[in-house]
Structures are given as structure tokens and as C-alpha cells.
């Protein structure tokens, strides 16, 4: 019996959505902005990526800040993604600097890290 192929399935929902790129052979995927955007100084923007992902069973995902944006003051906020989530993905980007940040369509904006999890059974013990 052949082993099941694990894959991160991506549904491009709307115009401008860009397929993420895997970093090497890691469990990290780079996502790109579908539009031009501006983050004001000390401000934030909620950026829709215009896509959905299907996290493989046995994993959970988390967005990470993208350090190679070359803008040291721009950070991201995220939540844990599980295989049962189906909503379109958005990312909140914060600009903690004193200059406007100008992003463009096709620019890398966030990383998704997939983390393998195990589901051990619960057993009662008299001593640990």
C-alpha cells in the first residue's frame, strides 16, 4: 500500500491571489500580497491574501513575521490554523516605525509554519 502524500492545498479565491512558495524542503511557506498597500506610522492594516489553505491532518499552522521584508518595524499578528479551518486567510501587519510603509502586489508579507503534532491517547496512571 502506497503512503499518502502530504500536501498543503491552496484555493485561490479571488483575483490577484498568489500561490505561496515553500522554503526549500521545510515546513515553512511564504505568502505574498495580492494588492498594493500602505501602513501608516504606528498603524496597522488587515490584508486579505484572497486564498484559503487546507492544513494537512496531523499538523497545525501559524503565521510568522517575515524578517526579510527589509522593514524592521513591520510585524504580524496571527492565530493557530487547524485542518478544520476553511475561511479565507488574512494577516494583520503592524508598523511600529515613524515612516509610512509601502507594500506592493507580489511582495512577500508573511510565513506560514506547519508543525507536526501527535495525538496520544489518554490513559489513567496511579503514579507519574
Curated annotation (Swiss-Prot):
Q: Which UniProt keywords apply?
A: Early protein, Host membrane, Host-virus interaction, Membrane, Transmembrane, Transmembrane helix
Q: Does the keyword Transmembrane helix apply?
A: yes
Q: Which residues lie on this side of the membrane: Cytoplasmic?
A: 1-26, 121-128
Q: What's its membrane topology?
A: Multi-pass membrane protein
- What Gene Ontology terms describe where this protein resides (cellular component)? host cell membrane; membrane
Give the transmembrane region(s).
27-47, 100-120
Q: Motif PBZ domain binding motif: where?
A: 125-128
Keyword Transmembrane helix listed: yes
- Residue ranges in the Extracellular topological domain are 48-99
| Family according to the record | Belongs to the adenoviridae E4-ORF1 family.
What functional role does this protein have? May modulate tight-junctions functions of infected cells through interactions with PDZ proteins. E4 ORF1 has ben show for Adenovirus 9 to interact with protein involved in tight junction regulation. May play a role in mTOR activation by activating PI3-kinase, thus overriding cellular checkpoint for translation.
How does it associate, per the subunit comment? May interact with host PDZ proteins through the PDZ domain binding motif (PBM), namely host DLG1, PATJ and TJP2.
Q: Please identify the protein, giving its name as recorded.
A: Early 4 ORF1 protein
Organism, by scientific name, is Human adenovirus C serotype 2 (HAdV-2)
